[in-house]
A protein has these predicted regions:
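Phosphate-group recognition and catalysis centered on beta-loop-alpha active-site segments
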Residues: 1-251
Length: 251
């Protein structure tokens, strides 16, 4: 069955990558969560997509040049109920405390000075929670990156964690180094698959699972469901759940 992964939480409704966004995703029957991860100046793992905070918070800080305390002082609410920056520790704790079976897909974001350090810090945290072998009865971890060298580094660091090589047509490194680390999962954007649906068969014939991002319209959700995509990554887990239920009833 196609998994529904809440992209940055239920980010179509709540501020992205905040605890309220993931709490709502649980209520909306998501099968898992997606988050980006960056390192702060004091080497803490936080859930932020951009290198700067201006798009999501009330101040403009560079994440890698700011301490966790400085980031925690910002307001990430986007005019909703007050929300703070989320640490990856809080992200994992929320998933474990839910008692639900969840797949956590974690996308690494990098700056040059932290070369390789992010993956090490993340693996240390997963080990602390007993999630580094992917044998937990409820919570499973998947690592994702557009950077093929990040996928390769993590494959050497911890081969027990499945890896997703994210793909988009304008990412030049992927043309030069298409499959370093031999990732088990391919992560194409929905726009790429709509233009080239034959890629799904190609990936499946290679023995790869397919996780598709960011699938937000009912039409695109049905496109994925009809083609047996392994996971839909969406800002609207409630709509994806409704579409999946309707699809399953129609079979």
């Amino acid at each position: 069955m196609t998994l529904i992964i809440a992209h940055r939480g239920a980010s179509g409704y709540k501020p992205e990558m905040t605890i309220p966004a993931y709490e709502l995703a649980l209520q909306q029957n998501a099968d898992g969560f997606e988050t980006d991860v960056r390192l702060t100046k004091d080497l803490q793992l936080v859930g932020i997509h951009d290198r700067k905070t201006s798009r999501v918070a009330n101040s403009d800080l560079i994440v890698s040049k700011s301490t966790l305390k400085q980031l925690q002082e910002l307001d990430f609410s986007n005019d909703q109920a007050k929300a703070s920056v989320m640490t990856i520790r809080e992200f994992i704790t929320l998933a474990l405390d839910s008692g639900k079976s969840l797949t956590l897909t974690i996308e690494t974001k990098h700056v040059t000075k932290h070369h390789g350090l992010l993956e090490h810090k993340l693996n240390e945290l997963l080990t602390e929670f007993g999630l580094n072998t992917n044998q937990h009865e409820k919570v499973k971890i998947v690592l994702m990156s557009f950077n093929p060298f990040a996928v390769l580094r993590f494959s050497k660091l911890n081969p027990l964690i499945p890896r997703v090589q994210l793909k988009e047509k304008n990412y030049p490194l992927l043309h030069l180094y298409p499959n370093p680390g031999n990732p088990e999962i391919v992560g194409p954007g929905i726009e790429l698959l709509i233009k080239k649906p034959d890629l799904i068969t190609k990936f499946k014939d290679q023995g790869k699972k397919v996780f598709v991002w960011t699938v937000n319209s009912p039409q695109d959700m049905r496109f994925c469901l009809e083609r047996g995509i392994d996971a839909i990554i969406t800002n609207y887990p409630d709509i994806a759940y409704q579409e999946r239920e309707a699809f399953l009833r129609s079979k």
